[in-house]
Amino acid sequence: MNLIVCVEDQMGMMFNRRRQSQDRILRQRMLEMIGQEKLYVSPYTAKQFEQQEKLVILDNPQSLRGNLWCFIEDPQHLPPEDQISRIVVYRWNRAYPSDRYFSIDLNLWELTSFQEFAGYSHEKITEEVYLNETIMD
């Protein structure tokens, strides 16, 4: 699986069962990155996308298998780490209140790409791509 997540400075993903932030340029970049592939999301996550023709909405995205793209906002829905071959981390470069955190230790993964870009509502968003070469689908 190709996992996409957004985190704040302390790896927080949610607060009080809500996403911490969102950004329209980040969403556009995400859809461009996956090309013609579908993006698997929860019903909650789907609400932030205007163009939903590339989305597949699932209640249980962590059950996915194979070389699929999945954007997960709630860390309680993260798949087992041994099913993930790529992680794309978008960093807000801000501190937000958090009570749910990204739990995968990225130090055990290979950082293969690092880019910064200006978002619509964020001056700087960092995109990091990590690979687990032992699990390439």
What are these regions (language model features)?
Residues 1-137:
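Enzymes that bind and transform nitrogen-containing heteroaromatic metabolites
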